[in-house]
Swiss-Prot record:
Annotated protein name in UniProt: ATP-dependent DNA helicase XPD
CDD domains per record: DEAHc_XPD-like (cd17915), SF2_C_XPD (cd18788)
Domain notes: [4Fe-4S]-binding is required for protein stability and helicase activity.
Residues that bind [4Fe-4S] cluster: C88, C102, C105, C137
Recorded catalytic activity of this chain's protein: Couples ATP hydrolysis with the unwinding of duplex DNA at the replication fork by translocating in the 5'-3' direction. This creates two antiparallel DNA single strands (ssDNA). The leading ssDNA polymer is the template for DNA polymerase III holoenzyme which synthesizes a continuous strand; ATP + H2O = ADP + phosphate + H(+)
Subunit and partners: Monomer.
Keyword flag Protein biosynthesis: no
Effect of C102S: Does not affect [4Fe-4S]-binding nor helicase activity. Loss of helicase, retains 20% ATPase
EC number: 5.6.2.3
Cofactor(s) needed by this chain: [4Fe-4S] cluster
UniProt cross-references to Gene3D superfamilies, sorted A to Z: 1.10.275.30, P-loop containing nucleotide triphosphate hydrolases
Entry binding sites for ATP: A29, P30, T31, G32, S33, G34, K35, T36
Length: 551
């Protein structure tokens, strides 16, 4: 018999009642407290079908795992959908969905019944292996299976981006919708973010089959070099490179030829002309603003509520859940949630801790404040990391505000370390950990290692210490100024907390959550910035009795 935890028993009826009364439920429950199982149970009490919306494919597994526990009593079917790059038989690493020319593929209409009796990622591997042998399409087979399953899982784009949601064509009103890791909704606009770099254009020139295309791309490359800057912050660009309608059509014809040829060869790689076309297509909409960032031209839509407006549809039953949800007012003002909301903080509701614990230490002789940054400060931070590493019982997760600061500090350290990059993977990190007794893991706030990893062995956390190097405030750049203007209009006042403190607080809590994934986990949290001494940080990070320290 499935036994519920104390908080699940106490809040189950309250959540079900809220959902039946058409409230959007916001559930703030610590990592490892059983949110997934709880949301499954309450959802199936309200509606016969459940849609889980998650950030990454890796997050399909907890749904499959917990559904297996329920299946012992109820015959509930499960399915999921991964993107074409992950399921197409001919897609190579790096290919984008639009690069894959399904309309020319003879397997598009060849589908098989999919039975999800294995973990999702293992099933995808099996489907791809069988698909090559038996000549069927894994992607369209998975898509077809969605319409027959009781519980389905999709990644964010299939829910928040109109064209992808319309493509899968399911009636959302039939489902109880559970949006997991909902603190990430702060970055939902990044799903459509596009960038243009010298490397992209140079690779497009190499791939191009047309002399005319190469001429257009060479001109574009020269224009790009005139407007991009090396700074690791968003700087608004006024004179954006332009392509005429005729030039875009020439590139589009070239792109289509490359797509056809790649399918004929049985290898669909990333087609860089497609990236350029999608960049200009989005730019033409008008709601995207161009910025220079680290030698790239980036277009962003700063209106987060544009993507989240679907949450206000009163015909939809929705649970938002996370271990680090922002406050209710933030969700209403910044995210634009206007419908009735039942906001539940589990530990406050039951007046009891349901997560692991940690000891806090504040370094009062360092800071990442802009006017205090120097080589001497980076050396101090490196000395702190050495000190922390040698007393640590296991691996040390270090979270930096930016790649620049991470490079300046970690380059001074010769200990066993793994430093996050664009190509970082959990597999590589595990290899580094298994090769050493303990490792300094360098990560950037909101990056894949500070939020997306779970390092455990035999139900024991492999991280004993979490170090926050400076406060991970967003940089005061042109993008933040635009956000500030929009938030001020919504609130009729400026709000430092909403712009700076709450996003940084969520980032820090997520990092701490990497080490305490279970109620029995314990870790040390090192807050290396003298600004953490303020009551705001000590209260919100539950560090009122923090130990102060100096080198």
């Amino acid at each position: 018999m499935l036994k519920l935890r104390d908080w699940q028993e106490k809040l189950k009826d309250k959540v079900i009642e809220g959902l039946r009364n058409n409230f959007l439920v916001a559930l703030n429950a610590p990592t490892g407290s059983g949110k997934t199982l709880f949301s499954l149970l309450v959802s199936l009490e309200v509606k016969p079908k459940v849609l889980f919306v998650v950030r990454t494919h890796n997050e399909f597994y907890p749904i499959y795992r917990d559904l297996t526990k329920i299946r012992e009593k109820r015959n509930i079917t499960f399915s999921f959908l991964v993107g074409k790059p992950s399921s197409c038989l001919y897609a190579e690493k790096g290919a984008e969905s639009e690069d894959i020319p399904c309309k020319y593929c003879e397997l598009k209409g060849s589908i098989v019944e999919v039975k999800t009796d294995d973990s999702p990622l293992s099933l995808v591997k099996k489907l791809k292996k069988d698909g090559l042998q038996d000549k069927f399409c894994p992607y369209y087979s998975l898509l077809n299976s969605l319409y027959k399953a009781d519980v389905i899982a999709l990644t964010y784009p299939y829910f928040f981006i109109d064209r992808y949601r319309e493509f899968i064509d399911i009636d959302l009103r039939e489902y109880m919708i559970v949006i997991d890791e909902a603190h990430n909704l702060d970055k939902v606009n990044e799903l459509e973010e596009r960038s243009l770099s010298e490397i992209t254009i140079q690779m497009a020139i190499k791939q191009s089959k047309s002399e005319e295309s190469r001429r257009i791309l060479s001109k574009l490359l020269n224009q790009l070099r005139e407007v991009v800057l090396p700074d690791e912050k968003y700087i608004k660009v006024e004179n954006v490179p332009k392509l005429s309608k005729e030039e875009l059509e020439i590139l589009a014809d070239d792109y289509e030829d490359i797509r056809k040829d790649s399918l004929k060869q049985g290898k669909v790689n990333k087609i860089h002309i497609g990236s350029i076309l999608r960049f200009f297509s989005l730019l033409s909409i008008g709601s995207f603003i161009p910025f220079s960032y680290s030698k790239r031209l980036v277009i962003k839509n700063p209106e987060i509520s544009y993507y989240l407006n679907l949450l206000n549809d009163n015909e939809l039953s929705i649970i938002l859940m996370s271990g680090t949800l922002p406050p209710r007012e933030y969700m209403e003002k910044v995210w634009g949630i206007k419908r009735n909301m039942l906001y539940l903080d589990v530990e406050r509701e039951i007046q009891k801790r349901v997560s692991g614990s940690y000891e806090c230490y504040i370094g009062v002789d360092v800071t990442s404040k802009y006017d205090m940054r120097s080589d001497n400060m980076w050396k101090r931070y490196a000395d702190y990391l050495l000190k922390i590493y040698f007393q640590a019982k296991a691996n040390v997760l270090v979270v930096f505000p930016s790649y620049e600061i991470m490079d300046r500090v970690m380059s001074r350290i010769s200990l066993p370390k793994y430093v996050e990059s664009e190509d970082s993977s959990v597999e590589d990190l595990y290899s580094a950990i298994s090769a050493n007794n303990k490792v300094l893991i360098g990560s950037v706030g909101k990056g894949k290692l500070a939020e997306g990893i779970e390092l455990r062995n035999n139900d024991r956390s492999l991280i004993s210490d979490v170090v926050i190097v400076g406060i991970p405030y967003p940089p005061p750049d042109d993008y933040l100024k635009i956000l500030a203007q929009r938030v001020s209009l919504k609130m009729n006042r400026e709000n430092e907390e909403f712009l700076f403190k709450i996003p940084a607080l969520v980032t820090i809590k997520q990092a701490i959550g990497r080490a305490i994934r279970d109620v029995n986990d314990k870790c040390n949290v090192w807050l290396l910035d003298k600004r953490f001494e303020s009551l705001y940080w000590k209260k919100n990070l539950k560090c009122l009795n923090a130990n102060k320290m100096k080198l």
